[in-house]
Amino acid sequence: MTERNSGEQTEKDAWRVDTDSHDGKDYVGAKVYVSEGGSTFAVTKDGDIISVCKNMSDKEKGHELLEKAVKAGGKKLDSFDGNFEFYLRNGFEPVSWTAFNENYAPKGWVKGRVKPEPVVFFKYTGKKYSKQSKDFWEIKEAQFYKKVKMSKDYDTAMSIRDKEV
């Protein structure tokens, strides 16, 4: 679970899918899934979906991974801002966020080459937003960041989200 061929992502975006940010203790008691095509996710005892990694050559789609994660008990996750719309379209609603912290930058992130992305904390609601829906434009990134104050750090943003789950 902690190894990943970063060549399966575009070089520009490989850092965004960082399974190395979790250590062994995060997986104790977790339900771990690895598809035949090498895509992964895990669901912790408290319903946190971690290590979502879609192998580009896998037949299984990203939305199918999330559906399986929810069926396995997943009800929340956090992700870099670049995945914002993907999670909105797949039943997750943003709750809180914090600024990118270079001290916790994932392996492969290069300062100056890639824009630092905020970390967004989502809860599962089951409501799938499409670009055609009015709600989508009300919750879109720009609106979300205007409406929701930035949390001072990762733990604070996580706590805010967890109170809503």
What would you call each of these model-derived segments?
Residues M1-G73, K140-V165:
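Glycine-rich short-loop/terminal segments
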Residues S21, Y33, F92-E93, T98, ...:
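A generic structural signal for solvent-exposed, polar alpha-helical segments
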Residues Y27, Y33, F41, F80, ...:
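Phenylalanine-focused residue identity feature
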Residues T44-P118:
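Acyl-donor binding region in acyl/amide transferases
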Residues E102-R161:
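C-terminal "cap" of GNAT-fold acetyltransferases
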